[in-house]
Amino acid sequence: MLGQSNYLALVGGGRQPKFPQNKLVIWDDAKQKVVITLEFRTSVLGVRLSKSRIVVALLNSIHTFVFSSPPKKLAVFETTDNPLGLACLGQKVLAFPGRSPGQVQLVELETGNVSIIPAHSTPLRAMALSPDGEVLATASEAGTLVRIFATSNCAKMAELRRGVDHAIIFSLAISPSNNLLAVTSDKSTLHVFNLPHPRNAPYSNQQASSSDDGVNKKWGILGKIPLLPRVFSDVYSFASAHFELGEEEPGPTYAPPLGTVLGRPPKGVIGWSNDNTILVVGSGSDGRWEKFVLRDDEEGKKHCIREGWKKYLGSGS
């Protein structure tokens, strides 16, 4: 969906798709009709919309168009295998996987200049662009670290540690103020991190881990002992909470949607309604949404608390 407008991007999927999987339809809900149709040789895995552009992710390429009727093709970029259809579209930049696993291509929309960010050594699993377009967060298939980059110069600003064991990252999302990052994974945990920003003072893992707010004091004095493994000094989330994965399992009755590789409905999709409220949505027969809020305790430390939930395809509360 394009912001809060009446335009919806639709791609066929499921057991009985209305549209073929290689066809993108832009639907005008106000006029109740199709206004743009695009067809490709392979399945559409991801779509991003802005007021001026349509971005389509295929398995090995990214296609950009002017948002007009008829649409005008602007560019095609080659990528490594991108089965999740990863792409982030801002007002000034477009980010998507590079030609090598773990790399990010960052395109400046006004000039078309392309920069390469060597973000990870393993394939990308998730990406998120801040609302102001100045910060890019990435995670790989390893699922232990989230790396933060400034889009203005592609510099790495921080590494945030989700955990020490392997995990499948479901979703990354940056808050409306550009100051917080939420992360979900198959560990059924929602993590919330403070996020560095280029407009603020220079940021480093050492500064974050020694901050006075206690956010990163997971290991206490161990984090300050030289030569210990970096896991003791890395930046951890300041708050976390459990979310529900649901009870359904992959099976012959479920047709996984395009852009997923888990053989099960998408889970843990994050949305911020404001800087203190996070929604986590899961689909499938056990589809539900959960609402989490960030609150300060008596000592001023923030906690992530589940305030409510509902099964939107069944009964719940």
Curated annotation (Swiss-Prot):
Involved in mitochondrial or peroxisomal functions and amino acid signaling pathways. The keyword Membrane applies. It holds the Pfam family PROPPIN. The gene is hsv2. Belongs to the WD repeat PROPPIN family. The keyword rRNA processing does not apply. GO terms for cellular component: cytoplasmic vesicle membrane; cytosol; phagophore assembly site membrane; vacuolar membrane. This is SVP1-like protein 2. GO terms for biological process: autophagy of mitochondrion; glycophagy; nucleophagy; pexophagy; protein localization to phagophore assembly site; protein transport. It comes from the Eukaryota. WD repeats lie at residues 119-159, 164-203. It is found in: Vacuole membrane; Cytoplasmic vesicle membrane. Keywords: Cytoplasmic vesicle, Membrane, Protein transport, Repeat, Transport, Vacuole, WD repeat. It is a peripheral membrane protein. PANTHER family: WD-REPEAT PROTEIN INTERACTING WITH PHOSPHOINOSIDES WIPI -RELATED (PTHR11227). One of its GO terms (molecular function) is phosphatidylinositol-3,5-bisphosphate binding. May contain a beta-propeller domain involved in specific binding to phosphatidylinositol 3,5-bisphosphate (PIP2), leading to the association of the protein to the membrane. The lineage of its organism: Eukaryota, Fungi, Dikarya, Ascomycota, Pezizomycotina. SMART domains: WD40. It comes from Emericella nidulans (strain FGSC A4 / ATCC 38163 / CBS 112.46 / NRRL 194 / M139). Gene3D superfamilies: YVTN repeat-like/Quinoprotein amine dehydrogenase (2.130.10.10).
